[in-house]
């Protein structure tokens, strides 16, 4: 469980890219992030025909990725009506009664498609139970506009793909829901592929270095609903009344593109151990480095711990798009991320095995916390 140490600090255990780790948290008042901590990057030049323009964005991304690991992007090319319609669809879905939502339960899916109820997860067992509700979809090549013929996908790729319909069939009572979610998903697919090239440039690689790894990507959406919770941090995690919106964690794949409404609640752990607000900024997405990218850069890029706490008194919605290499691909440290004489910190690993390892690490953390409580 979380422990209080010297005056002014506390400690939590978190499952990280390197396994369970202990982080010291300063008990300072929550504050908004500084522009130097979470910068706003105008990414419109990534669509330019000029390589120098595209490299200028890549350098800004590199600076952010080696600092806090979070940044906002503006002029990203995703129309406002797409995010507004997906937001409206999310509210329409989550405001239904629980029995109706459970018809699309994720427990009916073989690959994490569908609805997850509140109080069923503890993303960080060192904290309270998560009150978040979510609706998730995973990669389906039938809605990937870059895939021409699903029947031509190689067998070694198809073994990791599940094309399911149940989560759509069980939300068909909402006529605009499927269309709105897919529109958001497809817009983020296009943006993520463009940003993947930006990340390649940021690592002094050829712009297309990662293209082959994201032909059939690990790409999923979580539509998240956070009811308001009281700001009562005095409760210990073992208290049955302890609740968090979603506990402290890092994301698993390469990077995340997050849309959030105007309510706020996303908190990022700064490098010096302070919780800082990644407040909503209109017409932007928040992008954060995830674990696989930290791994392949030999820890040069930072997958930063974050959480959500909705203390606003209002309902909150966020829509996270999680982007990674295809599960059939390999997650390997890049040679050009090694200084002369520097050794690789990580062995090569299949991306599906990497995902399973991260889930296992979270399970191990859960066991540790149970033993210490």
Ranges and model annotations:
Residues 2-373:
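Peripheral, non-catalytic segments flanking oxidoreductase cores
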């Amino acid at each position: 469980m979380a422990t209080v140490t010297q005056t002014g600090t506390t400690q939590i255990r978190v499952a990280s890219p390197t396994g369970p780790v202990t982080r010291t948290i300063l008990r300072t008042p929550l504050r908004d992030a500084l522009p130097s901590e979470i910068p706003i990057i105008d990414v419109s030049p990534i669509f330019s025909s000029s390589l120098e323009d595209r490299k200028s964005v890549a350098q800004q991304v590199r600076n952010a990725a080696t600092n806090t690991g979070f940044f906002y992007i503006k002029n990203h090319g995703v129309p406002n009506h797409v995010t507004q319609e997906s937001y409206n669809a999310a509210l329409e879905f989550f405001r239904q009664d629980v029995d109706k939502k459970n018809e699309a339960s994720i427990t009916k899916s073989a690959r994490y498609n569908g609805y997850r109820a509140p109080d069923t997860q503890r993303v960080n067992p060192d904290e309270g139970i998560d009150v978040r509700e979510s609706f998730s979809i995973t990669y389906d090549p039938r809605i990937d506009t870059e895939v021409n013929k699903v029947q031509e996908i190689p067998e070694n790729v198809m073994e990791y793909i599940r094309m399911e319909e149940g989560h759509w069939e069980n939300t068909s009572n909402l006529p605009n829901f499927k269309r709105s979610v897919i529109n958001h998903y497809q817009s983020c697919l296009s943006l993520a592929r463009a940003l993947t090239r930006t990340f390649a440039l940021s690592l002094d690689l050829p712009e297309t270095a990662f293209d082959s790894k994201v032909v059939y990507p690990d790409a999923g959406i979580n539509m998240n609903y956070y009811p308001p919770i009281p700001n009562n941090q005095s409760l210990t995690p073992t208290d049955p009344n302890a609740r968090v919106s979603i506990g402290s964690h890092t994301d698993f794949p390469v990077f995340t593109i997050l849309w959030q409404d105007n309510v706020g609640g996303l908190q990022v752990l700064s490098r010096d151990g302070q919780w800082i607000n990644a407040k909503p900024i209109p017409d932007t997405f928040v992008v954060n480095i995830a674990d696989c990218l930290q791994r392949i850069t030999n820890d040069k890029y930072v997958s930063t711990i974050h959480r959500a706490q909705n203390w606003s008194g209002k309902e909150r919605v966020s829509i996270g798009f999680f982007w990674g290499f295809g599960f059939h691909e390999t997650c390997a440290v890049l040679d050009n991320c090694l200084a002369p004489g520097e050794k690789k910190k990580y062995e090569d690993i299949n991306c599906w095995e990497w995902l399973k390892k991260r889930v296992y690490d979270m399970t191990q953390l859960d066991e540790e916390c149970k033993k210490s409580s």
